[in-house]
C-alpha cells in the first residue's frame, strides 16, 4: 500500500516536471520555427547533463536557439565568439595582482556562466579547445595551480560551420566524444521559411520568453532524469546496438562504452521529459542518431554515419 502511494507521488512529480518541459518547448517553437525535433533533442541532452555540438551553416538560427534555451530555462547565459588568437585565460579567467592589498585576485572568465555558447569552436586554437573541453568534462578549471568549481548546472553549446576549412582547427575525435550530442538544424521547411519572412526576425521573440525554471530547479530535474528506471532488457538492447557498430566493414572504429552510457543517459532524459519513469525501446531509438553520429567515421564508400546508424536500428531487433 505504502509502495503504491509512493509510486503514485513519484509519477505525479514526473508528470508535473514533464509539463513544465513541454511548456518550455512550446515557447521555443515560437522562436525557432519548424524545428521541434532538434529542440526536443537539445532539451533531452541538457536534462541528461550533457553538452551539445551544433554543426550547421551560418544564418539558420544556432545562436538564437541557444539564447532562447538559456532564457526559457532561467540560466545565466554568455556567448563567446572563438577566434584563433584567443588564449585559455580569455575563457577561464586570470589572476590580477592588487599591489595595495599585496595579493592576487582571481577574475573569472566567461566559462563561469551556467550556459555557455562557444561560437565557432573550430576557430579556436587546439590549446583553447582543450581548455574548454577539460572544463566540460571536469566541471572545474585550474588557474595558476588553484581549482575553481564551475556553476551547477554547467552547459556548453558549441557551434561550428562544417563547410569552412580555412583558418579552422577541426576537433579531434577524442574531443568530439566529450559532446553528448551533435545536432544540425538544417534549412527551415518551406512553410516555416515563408512565415519567417512574413513575421520578421525571430530574435524579437526572445524578450517575451518566460523561464519555466531556474538553475536550482533544472539541477533537480537532471537528478530525477538520471533516476529513470532502465531495465536489463533496455541495457541489453543498447549493448547490441553498440556491438553492431563494431562489426567489420562499417566504421573505422566502433562505439566505446562511454558512447553507450551516453545513449543510456539520453534515453533516460527522453523518457523523463515525456512523463515516464522508465525507458522504452522507442526512447533509445529517439536519441540513438544524435548521440552517436559524431563519434563514428565510416569506411570509404560505406555511406554516411547517419545512414549506417539507421541501418543498425533497422536490423537490431528489440527483444
List each language-model region with its residue ranges.
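Walker B catalytic acidic pair
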Residues: 56, 119-120, 131
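Walker A/P-loop
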Residues: 47-83
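Conserved AAA+ ATPase small/helical "lid" subdomain
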Residues: 208-263
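Pre-Walker A (pre-P-loop) alpha-helix and adjacent loop at the N terminus of AAA/AAA+ ATPase modules
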Residues: 18-57
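Canonical AAA+ ATPase core
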Residues: 98-103, 120-128, 136-213, 219-228, ...
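C-terminal engagement/docking regions of AAA+ P-loop ATPases
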Residues: 247-319
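Conserved beta-strand position immediately N-terminal to the Walker
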Residues: 52, 116, 154
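Conserved alpha-helical scaffold flanking the Walker A/P-loop in AAA+ ATPase domains
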Residues: 41-44, 97-117
Amino acid at each position: 500500500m505504502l509502495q503504491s502511494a509512493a509510486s503514485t507521488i513519484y509519477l505525479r512529480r514526473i508528470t508535473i516536471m514533464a509539463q513544465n518541459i513541454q511548456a518550455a518547448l512550446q515557447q521555443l517553437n515560437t522562436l525557432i520555427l519548424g524545428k521541434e525535433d532538434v529542440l526536443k533533442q537539445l532539451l533531452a541532452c541538457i536534462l541528461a547533463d550533457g553538452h551539445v555540438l551544433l554543426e550547421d551553416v551560418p544564418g539558420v538560427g544556432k545562436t538564437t536557439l541557444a539564447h532562447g534555451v538559456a532564457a526559457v530555462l532561467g540560466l545565466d547565459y554568455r556567448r563567446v565568439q572563438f577566434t584563433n588568437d584567443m588564449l585559455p585565460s580569455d575563457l577561464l579567467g586570470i589572476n590580477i595582482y592588487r599591489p595595495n592589498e599585496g595579493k592576487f585576485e582571481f577574475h573569472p572568465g566567461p566559462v563561469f556562466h551556467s550556459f555557455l555558447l562557444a561560437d565557432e569552436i573550430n576557430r579556436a586554437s587546439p590549446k583553447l579547445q582543450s581548455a574548454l573541453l577539460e572544463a566540460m568534462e571536469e566541471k572545474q578549471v585550474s588557474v595558476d595551480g588553484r581549482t575553481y568549481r564551475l556553476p551547477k548546472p554547467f552547459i556548453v553549446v558549441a557551434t561550428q560551420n562544417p563547410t569552412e576549412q580555412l583558418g579552422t582547427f577541426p576537433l579531434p575525435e577524442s574531443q568530439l566524444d566529450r559532446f553528448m550530442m551533435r545536432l544540425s538544424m538544417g534549412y527551415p521547411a518551406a512553410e516555416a521559411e515563408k512565415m519567417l519572412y512574413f513575421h520578421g526576425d525571430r530574435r524579437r521573440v526572445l524578450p517575451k520568453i518566460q523561464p519555466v525554471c531556474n538553475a536550482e530547479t533544472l539541477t533537480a530535474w537532471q537528478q530525477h532524469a538520471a533516476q529513470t528506471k532502465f531495465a536489463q532488457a533496455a541495457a541489453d538492447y543498447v549493448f547490441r546496438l553498440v556491438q553492431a557498430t563494431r562489426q567489420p566493414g562499417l566504421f573505422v572504429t566502433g562505439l566505446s562504452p562511454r558512447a553507450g552510457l551516453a545513449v543510456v543517459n539520453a534515453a533516460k532524459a527522453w523518457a523523463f521529459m515525456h512523463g515516464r519513469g522508465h525507458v522504452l525501446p522507442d526512447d533509445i531509438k529517439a536519441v540513438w542518431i544524435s548521440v552517436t553520429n559524431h563519434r563514428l567515421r565510416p569506411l570509404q564508400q560505406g555511406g554516411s554515419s547517419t545512414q549506417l546508424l539507421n541501418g543498425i536500428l533497422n536490423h537490431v531487433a528489440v527483444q
